[in-house]
C-alpha cells in the first residue's frame, strides 16, 4: 500500500511542467521554514509568545533570500534524480546564509531570537527541505532496480554542454526506460567530468568501443546545433553497432515542459542531415496582418495548405476557411486544428476551384482579408499524362480564384508557385508559370493586392520523393533514383509555409517572391541519407538508377538570368523582376488552350510559358 501511495504521489508531481514544479516545491519549502521556526520556538521557550507578525517577517525574509540564492545557483527549488551532493550542500548554505542575513536585519528592529535558536532553525529547515529530495532519489533507485522487467535501456548521451545539461534537468520521470550510463562529448578535455552525476566517458570517436563495453542499446544526441556531417558520423557508428539513435526535442519545448520525461526524445530525421536553419516568424508584422482577421486557404487539406493553416492559427485570426476539393483531407485537418487551437472559428468548405460561381459565393459569404492559394496539381509525370487536368486546375482554377478575389473585393491574394515554373520543359511547371502571369495580370487592374511565392521541393509533402524512399526502404529496397546527377532544392514544409506567410505580409504590387532554398541537393545523396536514417547500409538497401521520367529536368532553377533580383525584403525572401502581361492577352491564350487537348495542348502551354519567362 505504501509503495503504491509513493508511486501515485511521484507520478502526480511528474505531470507538472517545470514551472509548476518550481511553484510546488517553493510552497513546500516555505511551509518547511514556517514549521521549523514554530518547532524551534516551542523547543526553546515552551510556548509561542511573540505575535504572529514577527514570525511572518523573519520567515518571509529568510525565504526570499533563500530563493534568490538557490535561483542564482540554478537549482530553482527543483528536485532531480541526478542531484549531486554539491546541490544538497548549496541548499544547506542557502538556508544558512538566508537565515543569518534575516537574523541580522530583524535583530536591529526585533531582537527576538538567540543565536542558538537560529542554529536550530537552520538545522530543522535544512532537514525538512532536503528530506523529499533525498527520498526522491532513493525511491527512484528502488523502483528502477526492482522493476525486473528488462525494459530499461542502457543509454549514452551525446553532448556535455548546455543541451546535455538541459536534457538531464528535464528528463526526470521515474518510470522512464531511460538509464543513462555515460556521456560523450566532442571536447576530449571534458573526459572525467560529471554532468548531473553522470560521468563523461570520452569523445564521439570512443563510441564504438565504449558502447560495446557498457552494452549500450540507445544513443541520444543533445546538441541542438550539431553539424549535419557529425549527425551522419554518429548514425553510421550506431548502425554498425546495432544501436538506436535519437535526438533531444527542440530546446523551447523542453524549457516549457511540453515533453514528458523519458518519452520526449525523437528520431533523427532527414532535416537534421540536410542542416536547414529554421526561420522564426515576425510576430509584430504578422500579428497586424493576421490577428482578428478572416483567412481563407485553398488546398487546405494538402501539405502546404494545411501547414499554412497551422502557422496562421498561432496569430489568433477570427476565422480560417478551409477550402478544398477532397473531403477526407479537409475533415482530418479540420479536426486536428480544432483540437490544437481554441477560440478560432474553423470553417470546412468543400469546393472545387474550377467552379467560379461556388468560389465567389464562398468569398462573398465569409469576406476573407487574405486568400492563400495553395490548391494545385503538382506531380510532374502525372501532369505529363494529363495535360488537360493540369490546365483546368492550375490555370483555370487560379484564374477563378484571382477573379473571385477581385469581384469580392478581398484585400490580398498570395499564390503558391514553384521553381518548376522557371524555363519549364513540362506541363506542371508551365501551368504554374501561367498562373504567375494571371496573378500579376490581375494585380495591374484590380484594387486587391496580388503576389506569388516561388520555391522548390518541400520535404515530406505528399507526392514528394521522401515518402517514396521511405516506402521503398520499408519494403527492403531497392531505392530508385532517376539519375544520380539530378539535383533539387529542398525546404521543410513548416519553413516554406512560414516564408509564404511572411512574403504575403510584404506584398504591395504584384511581386513574385523567390525564397532562398539554400544549396541544391543531389537526389542520390538524399537517398543515401534516407538509407542511413533507416539503420541500414547500402549493401542491405541498394540504390539503383532508373532513368529520367517524362517532363523531368536534371537541375531546377529558382530564376533565370534575366529575372534580376531587385531587393531582399527579409532574410531568405527576395523579389524577382518578372515579365508582366496584360490580363486581356492572358485571357486570349486561356481561350486558345481551352480548344486544345493532348500533346497539342501540352506543347502550346510549354511554349507560351517559356516565351513569357524572360523580362522585357
Features from the language model and the residues they span:
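Proline-aspartate-enriched helix->loop->beta-strand connector
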Residues: 211, 215-217, 317-318, 363, ...
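N-terminal Rossmann/SDR dinucleotide-binding element
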Residues: 258-271, 275-367
Amino acid at each position: 500500500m505504501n509503495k503504491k501511495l509513493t508511486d501515485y504521489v511521484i507520478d502526480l508531481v511528474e505531470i507538472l511542467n517545470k514551472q509548476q514544479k518550481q511553484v510546488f516545491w517553493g510552497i513546500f519549502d516555505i511551509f518547511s521554514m514556517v514549521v521549523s521556526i514554530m518547532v524551534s520556538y516551542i523547543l526553546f521557550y515552551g510556548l509561542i509568545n511573540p505575535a504572529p507578525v514577527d514570525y511572518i517577517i523573519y520567515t518571509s525574509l529568510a525565504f526570499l533570500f533563500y530563493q534568490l540564492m538557490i535561483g542564482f545557483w540554478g537549482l530553482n527549488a527543483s528536485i532531480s534524480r541526478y542531484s549531486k551532493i554539491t546541490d544538497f550542500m548549496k541548499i544547506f548554505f542557502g538556508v544558512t546564509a538566508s537565515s543569518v542575513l534575516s537574523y541580522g536585519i530583524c535583530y536591529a528592529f526585533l531582537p527576538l531570537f538567540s543565536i542558538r535558536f537560529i542554529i536550530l532553525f537552520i538545522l530543522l529547515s535544512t532537514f525538512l527541505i532536503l528530506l523529499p529530495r533525498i527520498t526522491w532519489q532513493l525511491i527512484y533507485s528502488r523502483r528502477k532496480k526492482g522493476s525486473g522487467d528488462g525494459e530499461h535501456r542502457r543509454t549514452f548521451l551525446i553532448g556535455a554542454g548546455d543541451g546535455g545539461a538541459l536534457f538531464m534537468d528535464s528528463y526526470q520521470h521515474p518510470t522512464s526506460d531511460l538509464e543513462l550510463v555515460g556521456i560523450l562529448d566532442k571536447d576530449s578535455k571534458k573526459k572525467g567530468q560529471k554532468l548531473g552525476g553522470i560521468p563523461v566517458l570520452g569523445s564521439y570517436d570512443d563510441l564504438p568501443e565504449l558502447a560495446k563495453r557498457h552494452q549500450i542499446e540507445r544513443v541520444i544526441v543533445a546538441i541542438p546545433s550539431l553539424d549535419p556531417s557529425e549527425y551522419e558520423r554518429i548514425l553510421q557508428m550506431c548502425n554498425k553497432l546495432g544501436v538506436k539513435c535519437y535526438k533531444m526535442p527542440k530546446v523551447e519545448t523542453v524549457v516549457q515542459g511540453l515533453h514528458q520525461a523519458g518519452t520526449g526524445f525523437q528520431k533523427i530525421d532527414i532535416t537534421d542531415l540536410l542542416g536547414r536553419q529554421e526561420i522564426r516568424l515576425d510576430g509584430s508584422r504578422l500579428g497586424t496582418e493576421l490577428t482578428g482577421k478572416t483567412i481563407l486557404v485553398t488546398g487546405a487539406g494538402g501539405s502546404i495548405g494545411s501547414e499554412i493553416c497551422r502557422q496562421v492559427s498561432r496569430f489568433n485570426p477570427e476565422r480560417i476557411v478551409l477550402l478544398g476539393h477532397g473531403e477526407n483531407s479537409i475533415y482530418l485537418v479540420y479536426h486536428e486544428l480544432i483540437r490544437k487551437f481554441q477560440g478560432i472559428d474553423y470553417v470546412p468548405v468543400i469546393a472545387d476551384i474550377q467552379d467560379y460561381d461556388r468560389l465567389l459565393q464562398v468569398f462573398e459569404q465569409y469576406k476573407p482579408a487574405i486568400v492563400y492559394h495553395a490548391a494545385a496539381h503538382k506531380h510532374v509525370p502525372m501532369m505529363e499524362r494529363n495535360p488537360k487536368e493540369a490546365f483546368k486546375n492550375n490555370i483555370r482554377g487560379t484564374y477563378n480564384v484571382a477573379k473571385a478575389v477581385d469581384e469580392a473585393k478581398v484585400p490580398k491574394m498570395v499564390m503558391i508557385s514553384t521553381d518548376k515554373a522557371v524555363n519549364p520543359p513540362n506541363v506542371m511547371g508551365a501551368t504554374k508559370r501561367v498562373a504567375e502571369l494571371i496573378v500579376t495580370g490581375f494585380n495591374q487592374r484590380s484594387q486587391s493586392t496580388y503576389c506569388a511565392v516561388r520555391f522548390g521541393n518541400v520535404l515530406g509533402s505528399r507526392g514528394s520523393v521522401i515518402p517514396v524512399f521511405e516506402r521503398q526502404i520499408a519494403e527492403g529496397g531497392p531505392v530508385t533514383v532517376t539519375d544520380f546527377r539530378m539535383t533539387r532544392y529542398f525546404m521543410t514544409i513548416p519553413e516554406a509555409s512560414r516564408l509564404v506567410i511572411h512574403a504575403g505580409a510584404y506584398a504591395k504590387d504584384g511581386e513574385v517572391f523567390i525564397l532562398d532554398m539554400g544549396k541544391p541537393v543531389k537526389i542520390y545523396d538524399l537517398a543515401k541519407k534516407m538509407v542511413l536514417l533507416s539503420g541500414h547500409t547500402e549493401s542491405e538497401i541498394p540504390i539503383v538508377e532508373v532513368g529520367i521520367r517524362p517532363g523531368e529536368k536534371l537541375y531546377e532553377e529558382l530564376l533565370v538570368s534575366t529575372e534580376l533580383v531587385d531587393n531582399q525584403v527579409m532574410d531568405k525572401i527576395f523579389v524577382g523582376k518578372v515579365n508582366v502581361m496584360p490580363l486581356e492577352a492572358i485571357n486570349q491564350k486561356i481561350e486558345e488552350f481551352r480548344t486544345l487537348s493532348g500533346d497539342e495542348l501540352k506543347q502550346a502551354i510549354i511554349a507560351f510559358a517559356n516565351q513569357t519567362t524572360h523580362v522585357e
